[in-house]
Regions:
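Eukaryotic intrinsically disordered, low-complexity regulatory linkers and tails enriched in Ser/Thr/Pro
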Residues: 1-72
Length: 72
């Protein structure tokens, strides 16, 4: 069964953002790690990314149902 990656955007103080694709378990670990602050390693589709959570302002996770074209 193929692994499904979810698109997320992580916003940082100063206005920069980082777009990544992660599996659901990694997203849940990131949410839990936010309370602790400090550094967190996130395994993404393209490889590991280390984030300093003290600078994170927001995390936006897109829904799984992506639509292309015209739909009703």
């Amino acid at each position: 069964m193929p692994v499904h990656h979810r698109r997320i955007s992580i916003g940082f103080q100063g206005g920069h953002s980082l777009a990544l694709r992660v599996i659901e378990e990694q997203l849940e670990e990131l949410y839990r790690a936010l309370d602790g602050g400090g550094w967190h390693e996130l395994e993404t589709e393209d490889g590991p990314v280390r984030l300093y959570l003290g600078q994170v302002v927001y995390i936006r996770a897109e829904n799984d149902d992506q639509r292309v074209g015209f739909s009703v």
